[in-house]
From Swiss-Prot:
Further information: Negative results: does not show effect on Cav1.2/CACNA1C, Cav1.3/CACNA1D, and Cav2.3/CACNA1E and shows a very little inhibition on Cav2.1/CACNA1A.
Entry protein name: Omega conotoxin-CVIF
Record's subcellular location: Secreted
UniProt GO molecular function: calcium channel regulator activity; ion channel inhibitor activity; toxin activity
Disulphide-bridged cysteine pairs: 1-16, 8-20, 15-25
Domain of life (superkingdom): Eukaryota
Keyword Secreted among UniProt keywords: yes
Provenance organism: Conus catus (Cat cone)
Length: 25
């Protein structure tokens, strides 16, 4: 799940859902 969070500005990338959210798995 590295590098995918670059597209998420104010939120962090969630590996569980595969989208930008305010938490991590």
């Amino acid at each position: 799940c590295k590098g995918k969070g670059a597209s998420c500005r104010r939120t962090s990338y969630d590996c569980c859902t595969g989208s930008c959210r305010l938490g991590r798995c």
